[in-house]
Amino acid sequence: MSSKELQEGQDGLVEKLVSVRRVAKVVKGGRVFGFSALTVVGDGEGRVGYGSGKANEVPVAIKKAMEKARRNMKDVHLDGGTLQYPINFKQGAANIVMLPASDGTGIIAGGAMRAVLEAAGVKDVLAKCVGTTRPVNVVRSTVNALTGMSSPELIAAKRGKSVEEILGE
């Protein structure tokens, strides 16, 4: 299922539904069906979170996933509307490649990765996922790759140097 923007919540967060799956539990009398939902929540200004929820009904599963995503928000250090530097990130079978792009490029990424980037507030990026394309793995890997990115200001503060020394200007 493609990512859908549900609404902008009462707290100003962008909420996106990435996937809904029907899951089955096999019991003695047959199968018991339920639903699993994966959602992404972000403020569009550098904070993003994801969550998954399970329930017997789709709306309840989505609500649980949204609550978990809100509790799981993380900061992303962006450079304007794009990334600080190119990212190659590997987690499990997912291999994430993201490149900063010039203004006006837009978000060139597929499905689940696009939902995360839009919710985080990234405006211009080139991105690709090699390996697994399962939405849960792609979302988890993309969020971890984005949160692992550091700004030059943070690196300079850690090293006790000025930003000019770090950037070599």
UniProtKB/Swiss-Prot annotation:
Pfam families: Ribosomal_S5, Ribosomal_S5_C. PROSITE patterns: RIBOSOMAL_S5, S5_DSRBD. The keyword Ribonucleoprotein applies. GO terms for cellular component: small ribosomal subunit. GO terms for molecular function: rRNA binding; structural constituent of ribosome. GO terms for biological process: translation. SUPFAM superfamilies: dsRNA-binding domain-like (SSF54768), Ribosomal protein S5 domain 2-like (SSF54211). InterPro entries: Ribosomal_Su5_D2-typ_SF, Ribosomal_uS5, Ribosomal_uS5_bac-type, Ribosomal_uS5_C, Ribosomal_uS5_N, Ribosomal_uS5_N_CS, Ribsml_uS5_D2-typ_fold_subgr. Residues 13-76 form the S5 DRBM domain. Signal peptide: none annotated. It comes from the Bacteria. Belongs to the universal ribosomal protein uS5 family. The N-terminal domain interacts with the head of the 30S subunit; the C-terminal domain interacts with the body and contacts protein S4. The interaction surface between S4 and S5 is involved in control of translational fidelity. With S4 and S12 plays an important role in translational accuracy. Located at the back of the 30S subunit body where it stabilizes the conformation of the head with respect to the body. This is Small ribosomal subunit protein uS5. It comes from Hydrogenovibrio crunogenus (strain DSM 25203 / XCL-2).
